[in-house]
UniProtKB/Swiss-Prot annotation:
PANTHER family on file: TRIGGER FACTOR CHAPERONE AND PEPTIDYL-PROLYL CIS/TRANS ISOMERASE (PTHR30560), TRIGGER FACTOR-LIKE PROTEIN TIG, CHLOROPLASTIC (PTHR30560:SF3)
Reactions it catalyzes: [protein]-peptidylproline (omega=180) = [protein]-peptidylproline (omega=0)
Record-given protein name: Trigger factor
Enzyme class: isomerase
Biological role stated in the UniProt entry: Involved in protein export. Acts as a chaperone by maintaining the newly synthesized protein in an open conformation. Functions as a peptidyl-prolyl cis-trans isomerase.
Localization, UniProt: Cytoplasm
Species per Swiss-Prot/TrEMBL record: Vibrio parahaemolyticus serotype O3:K6 (strain RIMD 2210633)
Chief location category: cytoplasm
Length: 434
């Protein structure tokens, strides 16, 4: 086998491979003999058919199969010999493919970029310093009460925090438009669900009042025919309601699965959940900054093949979230996922180089701690821990998580780290949307 390597544009490489004719002919003959030995042919005892007859019947098909197998096998031998690391499947193209002559073919593919980490000392990370305070717990309890609240009709004016039931009819230039009409429509004032000016026009009104308001649809409104249009809404307020919060008692507490200990037990459980959430938020915020700095300091070429693989993964995940099927996923435009896919590949390559350069291996104690921490969110942590320990795939997933965290720790160790005190809500509101 003869091999030459061409460097094309960017990460693309081409191998020119020559395979001696004897190798091809020997492989074709061996396969034809295998067919002659194992298949039945009319007029011949099994295994006694002449090889020339088998070659006449199956020669072309066998040769094509052999060429495919030979190209794949010699490609693998060539990349091992040349110490090349492909980033995706190759494209084969025969150059010379005559019977009795050497096979000459090319294999074109992308390679992984050579990454040399730099600038880790320039990365800046602001570590949040925060804790769950009593006021944070009380605020969360109030949020839970609001979630369990009921609405009661009141003889008061509509204002933020109240809910109104309204009839409305919208029109543009005197003509009603589709979707602009509703009866007994519930609208929570201050929630910002409607277009600008709509809630303002209702504020201060009481049940039984009928009136018109003038509004303008935003330029970025989702309905193309309404973008930027001036509209008039005829509105009738049917009723105004106020939120009635449940009392903070044992009955309320029981709704959250707290059987004993009353309000104090609920507060303790809420605090525990908030502290777990806070710990994860701090970890996420630090990781986010470390990765952002790593990407900023290290621009690398990205193999298109890896981006395509990641786009495929993101498509499948999107289809699963919306209850779709694999065929539907393939129809989703690649542009929806391209930027995120490229980012994932870049981060993966850079973190992989951190792991390699720091010679990191998943720490067993860290893996154990991560599983135990995750298990605390479940009713029976010991059952969850046992499940992980008995499932090798789940353990491997957790080892990968641990290894990534160790890579982040390695980046932080070389970065410029400062600390800043922040409140619980402030920190959680900084978390990016998933």
């Amino acid at each position: 086998m003869q091999v030459t390597v061409e460097t094309l544009e960017g990460l693309e490489r081409r191998l020119n491979i020559t395979v001696p004719a004897a190798n091809i002919e020997d492989a074709v003959t061996a396969e034809l003999r295998n067919i002659a030995k194992n298949r039945r042919f009319d007029g011949f005892r099994k295994g006694k058919v002449p090889l020339k007859m088998v070659a006449k019947m199956y020669g072309k098909a066998v040769r094509q199969d052999v060429l495919g197998e030979v190209m794949q096998r010699h490609f693998i031998e060539a990349i091992v010999k040349e110490k090349i690391n492909p980033a995706g499947a190759p494209t084969f193209a025969p150059v010379e493919n005559k019977e009795g002559a050497d096979l000459v073919f090319t294999a074109t593919f992308e390679v992984y970029p050579e990454v040399e980490l730099k600038g880790l000392e320039n990365i800046t990370v602001e570590k949040p310093l925060t804790e769950v305070k009593e006021a944070d717990v009380e605020e969360m309890i109030e949020t839970l009460r609001k979630q369990q609240a009921t609405w009661v009709e009141v003889e008061e004016a509509a204002e933020a925090g109240k809910r109104v039931s309204i009839d409305f009819v919208g029109s543009i230039d005197g003509e009603e438009f589709e979707g602009g009409k509703a009866e007994n429509f519930p609208l929570e004032m201050g929630a910002g669900r409607m277009i600008p000016g709509f809630e303002d026009g209702i504020a201060g009104k009481t049940a039984g009042m009928e009136f018109d308001i003038d509004v303008t649809f935003p330029e970025d409104y989702h309905a193309e025919n309404l973008k930027g249009k001036a509209a008039k809404f005829a509105i009738k307020v049917n009723k105004v309601e106020a939120r009635e919060l449940p009392e903070l008692n044992d009955e309320f507490v029981a709704k959250f699965g707290v059987a004993e200990g009353g309000v104090d037990a609920l507060k303790a459980e809420v605090r525990k959940n908030m502290e777990r959430e806070l710990k994860q938020a701090v970890k996420t915020r630090i990781k986010e900054q470390a990765i952002e700095g790593l990407v900023k300091e290290n621009e690398i070429d990205v193999p298109a093949a890896l981006i395509e693989q990641e786009i495929h993964v993101l498509r499948q995940q999107a289809a699963q979230r919306f209850g779709g099927n694999p065929e539907a996923a393939a129809q989703l435009p690649r542009e929806l996922f391209e930027e995120q896919a490229k980012r994932r590949v870049v981060v993966g390559l850079l973190l992989g180089e951190v792991i390699k350069s720091e010679e990191l291996k998943a720490d067993d104690e860290k893996v154990k701690a991560l599983i135990e921490e995750m298990a605390t969110a479940y009713e029976d942590p010991s059952e969850v821990i046992a499940y992980y320990e008995q499932n090798e795939q789940m353990m491997n997933n957790m080892r990968n998580v641990a290894l990534e965290e160790q890579a982040i720790d390695a980046i932080i160790a070389k970065a410029q780290v400062t600390e800043k005190e922040v409140g619980f809500n402030e920190l959680l509101n900084q978390q990016p949307a998933a």
